[in-house]
Curated annotation (Swiss-Prot):
InterPro entries: ClpP (IPR001907), ClpP/crotonase-like_dom_sf (IPR029045), ClpP/TepA (IPR023562), ClpP_His_AS (IPR033135), ClpP_Ser_AS (IPR018215)
GO biological process: protein quality control for misfolded or incompletely synthesized proteins
Enzymatic reactions: Hydrolysis of proteins to small peptides in the presence of ATP and magnesium. alpha-casein is the usual test substrate. In the absence of ATP, only oligopeptides shorter than five residues are hydrolyzed (such as succinyl-Leu-Tyr-|-NHMec, and Leu-Tyr-Leu-|-Tyr-Trp, in which cleavage of the -Tyr-|-Leu- and -Tyr-|-Trp bonds also occurs)
Name recorded for this polypeptide: ATP-dependent Clp protease proteolytic subunit
EC numbers: 3.4.21.92
Family: Belongs to the peptidase S14 family.
Annotated Gene Ontology cellular component terms: cytoplasm; endopeptidase Clp complex
Purpose of the protein: Cleaves peptides in various proteins in a process that requires ATP hydrolysis. Has a chymotrypsin-like activity. Plays a major role in the degradation of misfolded proteins.
Name of the encoding gene: clpP
Predominant cellular place of this UniProt entry's protein: cytoplasm
Complex formation: Fourteen ClpP subunits assemble into 2 heptameric rings which stack back to back to give a disk-like structure with a central cavity, resembling the structure of eukaryotic proteasomes.
Record bears the keyword Acetylation: no
Length: 196
């Protein structure tokens, strides 16, 4: 996130209150996932999901995504929490959802996965690098193949595409417009106007 965070002032019968913009959005059950997905960002997103679940498990949560992707295990912590809580999580792509960002976009509640018209969505296989002895590199290669299989299985389920198509399409960077992502099954609708 940017180092500059705007503040908003709300007037109530008890006076004025100042919020940073992200805290104010959280009051409306909006979470911003912006930037590279790493353990720190994932911990913040998970905490916000759990907080909103505790506040009201019957109300939807809106996860806005603008991300180039990031660490698979960090993304899985967000994914698992989205599935663990009772509240539906609606996903909305603003800007781009690439790699793990696209994966999370596809994991929103059925019928509640959206993208703005000029969004860019990209899926591919997980990236990794290994150094060390040959045995260590082999262990890392097996693990990345295991993660790739999990990601592809979940994408196939979310998109209703055949696993073989997902495997082929994720072999290299596969870019889509918002309309193409809808046709592919990654999202349910391209938003022209706010749905709130």
């Amino acid at each position: 996130m940017s180092s500059y965070i705007p503040y908003v002032v709300e007037k109530t019968s008890r006076g004025e209150r100042s919020y940073d913009i992200y805290s104010r959005l959280l009051k409306d059950r909006i979470i911003m996932l912006s930037g590279e997905i790493n353990d720190d960002l994932a911990a913040s997103i998970v905490a916000q999901l759990l907080f909103l679940e505790a506040e009201d498990p019957q109300k939807d949560i809106y996860l806005y995504i603008n991300s180039p992707g990031g660490v698979v295990t960090s993304g899985f912590s967000i994914y698992d929490t989205m599935n663990y809580i009772k509240a539906d999580v609606s996903t909305i792509c603003i800007g781009q959802a690439a790699s793990m960002g696209a994966f999370l976009l596809s994991c929103g509640a059925p019928g509640k996965r959206f993208a703005l018209p000029n969004s860019r969505i990209m899926i591919h296989q997980p990236l990794g690098g290994a150094r060390g002895q040959a045995t260590d590199i082999e262990i890392q290669a097996k693990e990345i193949l295991r993660l790739k299989a999990i990601l592809n299985d979940i994408l196939a389920k979310n998109t209703k595409q055949k696993l073989s198509k997902i495997e082929k399409d994720t072999d290299r960077d596969f870019f889509m417009s918002a309309i193409e992502a809808k046709e592919y099954g990654l999202i349910d609708k391209v938003l022209e106007k706010s749905f709130k």
